[in-house]
Amino acid sequence: MNIETLRKTAKQMVADGKGIIAADESSGTCEKRFTTVGVPCTEENRRIYRQTIITAPDFEKYLSGIILYDETIRQEDDNGERFADILTKKGILPGIKVDAGAKDLALHPDEKVTEGLDGLRERLAEYKTFGAMFAKWRAVITIGNNMPSDACIHANAHAMARYAALCQEADIVPIVEPECLIDGDHSIEKSYEVTVKALRKTFEELEGQDVVFEGVVLKASMVIAGKKAPKQSSPQEVAEMTLKALKETVPADLAGVVFLSGGQGDEQATENLDAMNKLGGVPWPLSFSYARAIQNPVLKLWAENPSANVGKAQSALIFRSKMNSLAAQGKYSSEMEKERPY
């Protein structure tokens, strides 16, 4: 483990208001998203769509990294150049999703545990040869009646810590993502309670595995009321409750925090990130690692005509990335949305 390499990479991931695009959807998730826009989910269509994202001009102004899927990190553009090499030339860090997905947690109905530790050391070594500089592992925590259980939080935190240790051993920065789902009708107070519990256990387990916090990036859920809650959360409430949860649980020497959008609306995710950065008062950079909240308009425009709409789709990608980059600096205003090219 080279601590300086890890620190340098982690710092680059959260520098200068830049964020990370999550383009690591599994083939199954891609199938769902492509079906909604009427595009067959073939391997070639997935390659062309990801090529549209990866070759967007000048998006390195707003992005520090892209999380790729196993299939994608092995793919090439139309000219035979590997996607990871294109990103590296742009100054964008290639990352890789390494978990094997959330599986049913034994004896705990409706709860999940993330698998994928078997063979991970060897997979990380291979991904490093492809140019991967960081990795991602996502745990899924459901908020509901008597959920999450202590067993669910512990099992996921322990697996995530072992993953993080293996990453650092390979000089790959781990993104740890304990996602508290926003499905359901829970209040923002319940979201806060669960988020604090999940984060506290995650960092306890990371410390137990001797993981170096300066070489870790947290991908955090925002503290927000469930989608079906009668009272929805304002950006100010989300900012106050989220920063309160982070201050209570996250070590000051962590490299940085990037937020997942978790099914929020595109502008909602941007507004909430901006509110947090305007509030400030935390020791870490606060940025974004969005999938749908950036890709929604991109996929829609591309799907209308995959060969002719590449430029339009890329303009949407650049615009949403720019809006979120401004939000990561507390410089966003909803008035700016009037300039959007879609």
Language-model segments: residues:
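Short, histidine-centered active-site or binding-site loop motifs used for metal coordination
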Residues: 100, 141, 180, 222-224
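Hydrophobic residues within beta-strands of alpha/beta enzymes
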Residues: 66, 135, 174-175, 216, ...
